[in-house]
């Protein structure tokens, strides 16, 4: 098997694990374990906490003491055990701590999988710029396949989804032992601990434009987590209406939600055109408007013919909402930051989005869901309209508050990756 194919298998399993539970665990906790919205939000906030502290720490370990593929193997071995135990947990506080341990082991594997891929491709004499994107696409495929499997097997409200994720983690841990050895980087005496942790990038907050950018990254990061947490429970709640109880939306909500991931792949291909033609500010603004539409379509969507079209449109615009912000934001950081702290700045960007933003978004969205619930019945239309209003508010403030002059030549030859 070629190294490219071996890495595709790794990428497939990496995101298959996540897809097994990320969008359905909320439904399991709400409908089966009867957790509150705040409980569910707290459990999902573990992802944000782990994203803040773990990638930098694990990066130091992989750089200094442990080969990357071995660190990757150990992380997934921990995930396998923790996810197996999580399937038996029924207390919300315990679920938070268990999923926090899982997140602290899993979140570093995203960066480690990229590092392993780049190193293996370099060892094989392949150009990562052209060879890596097809490998990463297999990750999206793995995520979608897992969602479909859990949905078709009717496991969305069952703890078995966690057993599936545990088994896949164990398989990937064993598979990692077969990967080529990744040499430990030689120590550089001039590299400080703060630099390794990405803390030197905090100097960017002295620049007003960069400070505003990172602030918006955090606030929009809060939006990214909302549909992962509550999109699936929202669709399951249509079962309360006898008219929709046997509908496709209620029976297979994850299959419908997987259209969002499919849309991601399509919108990725359009990013170079939009960046060059309209500039980063406009592309990021389009993302915020797309988030407004995402939530707005959810507010008025249902399993009826017209309502289903709105739900489908919500899934499609998700691709724009997610990709246009994450990737254009990364390109902006690449352009604006000095090369000496560029890697740290990219890490700070991801920490603000997937760490602080995701943590805040998980907790506040859970509180909002509870606030607009009466006797366990959620007013989903109001909930989604509140989230849509928040995204629209961000778009308006961003339009007037973020200054950026578009120069097509700056991004003419810049590669865009996801």
Curated annotation (Swiss-Prot):
Top-rank taxon, per record: Bacteria
Cytoplasmic side: 1-9, 63-70, 113-136, 181-209, 276-277, 328-348, 403-418
Molecular function terms, GO-annotated: cytidine transmembrane transporter activity; nucleoside transmembrane transporter activity; symporter activity; uridine transmembrane transporter activity; xanthosine transmembrane transporter activity
Regulation: Transport is abolished by the proton uncoupler 2,4-dinitrophenol.
GO cellular component: membrane; plasma membrane
Reactions accelerated catalytically: xanthosine(in) + H(+)(in) = xanthosine(out) + H(+)(out)
Membrane topology classification: Multi-pass membrane protein
InterPro entries listed in its UniProt record: MFS_dom, MFS_trans_sf, Nuc_H_symport
TM stretches of this protein: 10-30, 42-62, 71-91, 92-112, 137-157, 160-180, 210-230, 255-275, 278-298, 307-327, 349-369, 382-402
Gene knockout outcome: Mutant grows very slowly on xanthosine.
Keywords from the UniProt entry: Cell inner membrane, Cell membrane, Membrane, Symport, Transmembrane, Transmembrane helix, Transport
PROSITE patterns membership: MFS
CDD domains: MFS_NHS (cd06177)
Residue spans, topological domain Periplasmic: 31-41, 158-159, 231-254, 299-306, 370-381
Location in or out of the cell: Cell inner membrane
GO BP annotations listed: nucleobase-containing small molecule metabolic process; nucleoside transport
Biological function: Uptake of xanthosine. Can also transport other nucleosides such as inosine, adenosine, cytidine, uridine and thymidine. Transport is driven by a proton motive force.
Family assignment from sequence similarity: Belongs to the major facilitator superfamily. Nucleoside:H(+) symporter (NHS) (TC 2.A.1.10) family.
Name under which the protein is recorded: Xanthosine permease
